[in-house]
Amino acid sequence: MTKSPSRLAEMRFQMTALSAQLRWGTNLELEPVRRREGELLVCGMGGSGISGDFLQAVAAAEGRRTTVHKHYGLPGWAPSLRPSVVAVSYSGNTAETLSSWEEARKLGLQVTAITSGGELAEMAALAGEQLVVIPRGYQPRSALGFGLSALLRVAAQAGAISDPQPSLEEAAHLADSLSGPKGEGIGFASELASAMGGRMVGVYGSVPLTQVAAYRWKTQTNENAKRSAFWSVLPETTHNEIVGWDLPQGLARRRVGIVALRDRDEHPGVSRRFEVLEKLTADRVTWVGEVWTQGFSPLGRLISLVAMGDLFSLELARNSGADPMAVDLIDRLKEEMHTSADSAPEEPSGF
């Protein structure tokens, strides 16, 4: 792989749009829908599916529940509990999400589509179901703000969460201040990436909030930096995974770097576990650094970590000369799936 400043600059430009994308959602006008029944079920894969994970965390902070489905069809309980379904696919051609849409329609469930076009938009329009069209022209993983803000607005309309407008505004401000053109997080992300070096990236989050951001960091590292990475969640990690760092001759310390994502409202027990875990494993694995949430609302705090993780992944790409735009193996997998199984064509960029 060769270093491509223009490709890196293009992805960097797309990432700086996070703030504007979130603000786009505050001005979104939604079509009225009939009264929804049951809990909200979000169906989507990759970057679309992760918007459901963010919604789930925001709803949980309000004492409410939503469910995310990242598979073909619908969960086995859907026919009896009859959820309201939101199908999210940036391209509108994601095979698993189209399968979920078709199953929901067969069951006569209330369905909303969030997409930039493709088959999903066509089916929603033909069926007369609620359709939220988001702007095209982005790499799907750099269009999180569009899908997430639209999903939050739909969820609020359904009564699954409270009005997200204030938290969207806060999140947009944080995204701009951290990862905008003059973002204050750029220098720290560069230092973090340099400290990581060529190690495998491990990202530790915690229940209930930063675990979602940890997964985003992991997937952005995979796609932008072309780097193997993993994520894990406290407190569960301290009951199993940590034993795996007890390798001979400092093997893990040389090859693995851990970034801890911390939140000011994390459980005191989790805070203590982070401290003790680092103390006990400091000679076994490299703790590269901590990144703390900023902001007040659950959404704002999550977006602050998203902004930093996006910057971190791009700095890793810069340091190694990786092309952050390409996802060749994903493209090849989808071509093989389409050729061998007569499946719907999917978007070429991962979700």
Describe the predicted segments one by one.
Residues G244-D328:
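C-terminal active-site/capping subdomain that shapes the small-molecule cofactor and substrate pocket
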Residues D323-F351:
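Short, small/acidic-rich helices and loops at N termini and domain boundaries
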Residues Q21-W24, A150-V154, V212, E223, ...:
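Short, hydrophobic/amphipathic alpha-helical patches that form generic packing surfaces
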Residues S84, G145-L152, T219, I242-P248, ...:
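Short, surface-exposed amphipathic charged segments that create phosphate/polyanion-binding patches used
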Residues R7-A9, F13-Q14, A20, W24-V33, ...:
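Active-site phosphate/pyrophosphate-binding segments
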Residues R35-L178, D263-E266, S271-V285:
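Glycine-rich phosphate-binding loops that contact phosphosugars or nucleotide phosphates
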Residues H69-Y72, R227-T238, W287-F296:
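A generic structural motif
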Residues M1-R7:
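Polybasic, low-complexity association/targeting segments
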